[in-house]
Amino acid sequence: VKLKSKQQSEINEFMREYADRSYKTPMNAVRLSAEHTDAHRRGIFEVCNALLTEGIPFYTEVRLTCGCIPDIVTPTHIVPFIEVLGTETMQMFEDLKLHKYPEEFRQRYSSGKLKSFIFVDAKEEFNKDVLF
């Protein structure tokens, strides 16, 4: 994916501010974890494939400086984080994961005005419209 300079600047700024740079994460490469369920891994692949088709840069398994590892990071997209829910529910995400994200994204999530996350249910057939 050829990036415009504005997109590259957005990515650089996001990664400088939030990503743990001691871990190298290539752009537009799908990294999967054996610890995830098959449905969860397939969900991540489907989302990444749709993003790639649309020319939207993404990163998977990015370790943030706060210690959190979102499923997919999309610094130039509508929202910065895409979470694929496999065995967990929205309530489980809120109880177990949300507090690990940087404060400004938690506040945006809680305000209901601006979105920080897109959630994809791995148990349902993937529909790329949920990403846009």
Spell out what each predicted region is.
Residues 1-49:
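Interdomain/boundary linker segments immediately adjacent to catalytic/signaling cores
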Residues 9, 13-16, 53, 91, ...:
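Polar/charged alpha-helical tracts
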Residues 16-28, 55, 76, 97-100, ...:
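Short, flexible coil/linker elements and helix-boundary hinge sites characteristic
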